[in-house]
Curated annotation (Swiss-Prot):
Matches recorded under PANTHER family: FORMAMIDOPYRIMIDINE-DNA GLYCOSYLASE (PTHR22993:SF9)
Stretches annotated zinc finger (FPG-type): 237-271
SMART domains: Fapy_DNA_glyco (SM00898), H2TH (SM01232)
Protein name (Swiss-Prot/TrEMBL): Formamidopyrimidine-DNA glycosylase
Organism: Hahella chejuensis (strain KCTC 2396)
Amino acid sequence: MPELPEVETTRRGVAPHITGRKILQVNIYEPRLRWPVPMDLPAAAQGKTVLNVTRRAKYLLINLGDDELLFHLGMSGNLRIVAPETPRMKHDHVDILLEGDITLRYNDPRRFGCLLLLNPPTQEHPLLKHLGPEPLSDQFSGELLYKRSRQRKSPVKTFLMDQAIVVGVGNIYANEALFLAGIRPTRAAGEVSLKRYQVLAEAVRKVLSDAINMGGATLRDFVGGDGKPGYFQQTLRAYGRGGQPCTVCQTELKEIKLGQRTSVFCPSCQR
């Protein structure tokens, strides 16, 4: 699933190509995504100019002034810039044609993503209003994690992946951040000290920033706005390495299921 770094990579890839350009036409080839694409979306978007492209958690928001297009890439989706004459592939579901011979194409093999119309643009939409702070913003800190974790008995990894606590820390990056911070994913969130949460917050920032700079992690279908895969997966130290030696102490990494997600940790380095 595309996580925050992959969505931010997509935003950075497509924004320079579409910002300031007028939408000429929207072609919906397959409206049956996670939620049906609104029937009035093509008419609402046509003739509007893209003012900016922003990201909130794993959602991409294309601002058109009075309206906003909300994209979620789901489990396997991607947005990329193509030439208008580029042949459409099997899972290409939406084309947004813009002036200057630019086409923004949405591809989603599993169709778990979405394209919605927000009118007017609002952070009060049900998909957005209950989200926690951005992990790369000033609102995110070790102090915040510490305060929100008190009395919680759930594992710290589950707590870290709660989108109401902090957005965008999916399974890959939660594994990596906890490894970097030396915190075992099974430890109760309420038992982690303020000092260790401060270390964890910095680890989250580093892991996500590094992933963004490397174009995200391509494990299955993800490609950026330029159609190229990311390469952060080449630097993974925990995720996907169960049974392999720890890169720090050479202890065999342990792999377990935690909340139906795979968790990998070092029994020696993480406590």
